[in-house]
């Protein structure tokens, strides 16, 4: 059973942000309405605003539990990977914030052309509507990965230095690592860990750090399910494990859960059930890396009702293409 005393509700009342569009951190104005307007137009914030945004979220998220409780109805989303215009298409498909409640399962940055604008928009929405959007940490929300696969270079190119990247990574450190929907569905980015048998154990991890190369925090970000595996196998990714139906069913039974929901792996159709519908993979980056040709999906939960909505990539003519090279990489 889950110790519900370990679950901390969101500490910031979004009503306080609704009362006024301007707030302060130190001497810096916090202007969520203006920031959302800019970010929705694929514009990144001035450096001082970006730092203020990050500092505010760090203070708030540091008080959150590792696994945050979420009530349905809610829409679950997978990897985005800097595909800003496809994120807008996702909102057209699933509904806008705050009209639709969302859980995003990580990997907002790297690979796509607009990692900075993508994560900025999501962070601004989180600031304005903390009870309507939950952002989990993925394996790309780390210094080690984002330094290499696009996000650091993008911040460097757009701001002229790496300071903003450092601030975003500080926010990444305190993003929750799981969401528990209706005390029945657990959402994480990657998968399970042989060192974590219960949600209570997951709650006790020290998440406020760089994602390590091994251990349970690493496993939650990096592990994958496999139909051909029964127990635990070391992953060929170089981090995490591959796990099977037996492991999944035992974890669900031990924690009185009905479903494990995750992302982390490209699914051509955008959504895939495994293990007799005990595990679901959601993928929300259509035409991944602008070449894979895959569809994308969002997964809707409303009590015992579950449904999937699919969407495709925005046509090339509807998106701008920056002059920048994406490093060859496929995780």
UniProtKB/Swiss-Prot annotation:
Phenotype when the gene is knocked out: RNAi-mediated knockdown causes lethality in 17 percent of animals. In the 1-cell embryo, cortical contractions are severely reduced and the pseudocleavage furrow is absent. Positioning of the spindle is abnormal due to reduced pulling forces that prevent oscillatory movements of the posterior spindle pole during anaphase. In 15 percent of animals, causes defects in chromosome segregation resulting in daughter cells with multiple nuclei.
Annotated binding of Mn(2+) 1, by residue: 79, 81, 107
InterPro entries in UniProt: Calcineurin-like_PHP_ApaH (IPR004843), Metallo-depent_PP-like (IPR029052), PPA2-like (IPR047129), Ser/Thr-sp_prot-phosphatase (IPR006186)
GO cellular component: astral microtubule; cell cortex; cytoplasm; phosphatase complex; spindle pole
Top-level taxon of origin: Eukaryota
Catalyzed reactions: O-phospho-L-seryl-[protein] + H2O = L-seryl-[protein] + phosphate; O-phospho-L-threonyl-[protein] + H2O = L-threonyl-[protein] + phosphate
Species this protein is from: Caenorhabditis elegans
GO terms of molecular function: metal ion binding; protein serine/threonine phosphatase activity
Protein name according to UniProt: Serine/threonine-protein phosphatase 6 catalytic subunit
Lineage summary: Eukaryota, Metazoa, Ecdysozoa, Nematoda, Chromadorea
PROSITE patterns in the record: SER_THR_PHOSPHATASE
Residues holding Mn(2+) 2: 107, 139, 189, 264
Function comment: Catalytic subunit of protein phosphatase 6 (PP6). In complex with saps-1, promotes actomyosin contractility during cytokinesis by regulating the organization of cortical non-muscle myosin II nmy-2 and thus contributing to correct spindle positioning. Also required for the proper generation of pulling forces on spindle poles during anaphase by regulating the cortical localization of gpr-1, gpr-2 and lin-5.
UniProt cross-references to PANTHER family, sorted A to Z: SERINE/THREONINE-PROTEIN PHOSPHATASE PP2A-RELATED
Cofactors (names): Mn(2+)
Enzyme class of the recorded protein, top EC level: hydrolase
Protein family per UniProt: Belongs to the PPP phosphatase family. PP-6 (PP-V) subfamily.
EC number from the UniProt entry: 3.1.3.16
Subcellular location field: Cytoplasm; Cytoplasm, Cell cortex; Cytoplasm, Cytoskeleton; Cytoplasm, Cytoskeleton, Spindle pole
């Amino acid at each position: 059973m889950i110790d519900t005393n370990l679950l901390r509700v969101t500490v910031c009342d979004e009503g306080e942000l609704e009362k006024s569009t301007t707030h302060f951190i130190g001497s810096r104005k916090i202007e969520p309405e203006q920031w959302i307007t800019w970010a929705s137009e694929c514009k990144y914030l001035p450096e001082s605003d970006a730092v203020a945004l990050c500092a505010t979220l760090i203070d708030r998220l540091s008080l959150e539990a590792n696994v945050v409780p979420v009530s349905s109805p809610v829409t679950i989303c997978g990897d985005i990977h800097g595909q800003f215009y496809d994120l807008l298409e996702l909102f057209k498909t699933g509904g806008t914030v705050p009209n639709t409640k969302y859980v995003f399962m990580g990997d907002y940055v790297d690979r796509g052309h607009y990692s900075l604008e993508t994560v900025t928009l999501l962070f601004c929405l989180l600031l304005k509507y903390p009870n309507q959007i939950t952002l989990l940490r993925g394996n790309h929300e780390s210094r080690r990965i984002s330094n290499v696969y696009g996000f650091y270079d993008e911040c460097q190119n757009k701001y002229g230095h790496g300071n903003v990247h450092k601030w975003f990574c500080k926010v990444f450190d305190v993003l929750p690592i799981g969401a528990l929907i209706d005390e029945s569905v657990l959402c994480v980015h990657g998968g399970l860990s042989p060192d974590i048998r219960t949600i209570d154990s997951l709650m006790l991890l020290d998440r406020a750090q760089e994602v390590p190369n091994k251990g349970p925090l690493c496993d939650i970000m990096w592990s994958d399910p496999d139909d051909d595996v029964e127990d635990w196998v070391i992953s060929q990714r170089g981090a995490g494990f591959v796990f099977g139906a037996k492991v999944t069913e035992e974890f669900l039974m031990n924690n009185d859960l009905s479903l494990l929901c995750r992302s982390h792996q490209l699914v051509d159709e955008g959504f895939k059930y495994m293990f007799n519908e005990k595990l679901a993979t959601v993928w929300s980056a259509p035409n991944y890396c602008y070449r894979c040709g895959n569809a994308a999906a969002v997964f809707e939960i409303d009590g015992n009702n579950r449904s999937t909505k699919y969407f495709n990539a925005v046509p090339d003519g509807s998106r701008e293409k920056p002059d920048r090279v994406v490093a060859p990489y496929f995780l």
